[in-house]
């Protein structure tokens, strides 16, 4: 499922992502990034994915700038989504070992300039399992390979996306 973003979308996402980063760093919210990119770039990339999800499903993105740790990125069809983004074309679904009680479903999004490709999703209990813990060089993280994700095109027995 690919979502194309136009120049105005990109500008909005850049602004919100950068502002969220400033607020979170000023309020000492712990940065749980997994990777070598800067926290600013990761926050912008993350909001690009959140915004693209909202645009595709015709929901309103969360423009909130209050400091936060945890929570969810989108609410749709009764489920709370955490959208995990990467710029790696072969990216996997990755989250920290800090369990977020506010999330039902995790989504993998590949961000490539003006396009966001939603690869698939996993229910929380499919991702948060001991056998999915791997140290990728930044400490233990939950990792789910792409072939274990539910495909957006094929759907799921529960209509969630």
Name what the model sees in each region.
Residues 1-77, 84-161:
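Nucleic-acid endonuclease domains
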């Amino acid at each position: 499922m690919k979502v194309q973003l136009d120049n105005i979308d990109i500008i909005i996402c850049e602004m919100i992502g950068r502002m969220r980063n400033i607020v979170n760093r000023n309020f000492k919210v712990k940065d749980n990034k997994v990777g070598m990119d800067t926290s600013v770039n990761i926050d912008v990339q993350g909001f690009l994915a959140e915004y693209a999800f909202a645009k595709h499903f015709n929901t309103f993105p969360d423009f909130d700038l209050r400091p936060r740790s945890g929570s969810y990125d989108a609410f749709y069809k009764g489920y709370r989504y955490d959208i995990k983004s990467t710029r790696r074309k072969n990216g996997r679904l990755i989250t920290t070992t800090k369990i977020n009680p506010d999330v039902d479903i995790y989504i993998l999004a590949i961000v490539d300039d003006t396009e966001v490709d939603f690869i698939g999703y996993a229910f929380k209990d499919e991702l948060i399992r001991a056998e999915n813990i791997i140290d990728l060089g930044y400490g233990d993280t939950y990792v789910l390979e792409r072939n274990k994700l539910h495909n957006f095109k094929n759907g799921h027995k529960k209509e969630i996306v």
